[in-house]
From Swiss-Prot:
GO terms for cellular component: plasma membrane. Residues 42-67 are annotated as: Disordered. InterPro entries: Hemerythrin-like (IPR012312). This is Uncharacterized protein Mb2018. The lineage of its organism: Bacteria, Bacillati, Actinomycetota, Actinomycetes, Mycobacteriales. Pfam families: Hemerythrin (PF01814).
């Protein structure tokens, strides 16, 4: 969300933003037809990665993705992989050895997309902004440590799920424990970032810095993952979910 509309310091900062960062509440207050198009078409410069909800959207009408939104949707990828890990644990506890390839592929995505890319963005750009301002330093210290611990657990999952790895009962038990530990750590980790760390960026960054960070994130995403970027990773996760029979969202609806 670009601006909440609430009387907070964060909103004061974002009101200085150029027209490209029009807030969602502001958009809702504008007429859905002519006035809305005029407001969006006023965007200038090179905005961060646009949202592509409508196929007929012109470049002038595209709504930019902010840095916190970018990081939060990447957390969505992580959440889906944690669900894959949960399904893997369920199957391992039922003496099912079949999920090993899917778990290995999931751990590879965590390594390349979450740890080597997403986590590095946080450590290089997000945490320093807060630490330099003397804000949330106790939290960023813990988050950095958890990033390191996560890499250790991912190393173990990758090693345990290779084709050459022994997959006897003790190995399966250890794998399930490592995945459970990863889930237990990163669920509160990403929740704290989404609700405390990322919102605090508005208190310590100018509108220009906020926009520049979003552009930096977009450039790095495409450099590492190609033009499709984030969507290509989402598609890979969806394929893994389908292979495990957990892609259909309706199956999670209680009766």
């Amino acid at each position: 969300m670009v601006a909440s509309g609430a009387a907070t310091k964060g909103v004061t900062v974002m009101k200085q933003t150029p027209p490209a960062a029009v807030g969602r509440r502001h958009l809702l207050e504008i007429s859905a037809s002519a006035a809305g198009v005029i407001a969006l078409s006023a965007c200038s410069g090179s905005p961060p990665e646009p949202g592509k909800g409508r196929p007929d959207t012109t470049p002038e009408q595209e709504v930019p993705v902010t840095a916190p939104e970018d990081l939060m949707r990447e957390h969505g990828v992580l959440k889906r992989i944690l669900l894959i890990y949960r399904e893997g644990i369920r199957r391992l506890q039922a003496d099912d050895q079949s999920p090993a390839p899917a778990l290995n592929e999931s751990a590879q995505i965590i390594r390349r997309f979450i740890e080597d890319y997403h986590g590095q963005l946080e450590e290089q750009y997000v945490f320093p902004k807060l630490e330099q301002a003397g804000k949330l330093t106790d939290i960023t210290s813990v988050l950095r440590t958890q990033h390191q611990r996560g890499r250790v657990l991912t190393d173990r999952v990758l090693a345990a799920t290779t084709a050459a790895a022994a997959f006897d009962q003790p190995a399966r038990d250890t794998l399930a424990q490592d995945m459970a530990a990863y889930i237990r750590m990163f669920e509160p980790h990403e929740a704290r970032e989404d609700t405390v760390v990322f919102p605090a960026l508005r208190d310590v960054m100018s509108a220009v810095e906020f926009r520049d960070m979003a552009e930096t994130f977009e450039d790095e995403e495409h450099r590492r993952f190609g033009e499709a970027g984030f969507q290509s990773v989402v598609d890979k996760v969806a394929d893994i979910e389908k292979s495990l029979g957990i892609y259909d969202l309706s199956q999670f609806t209680p009766s």
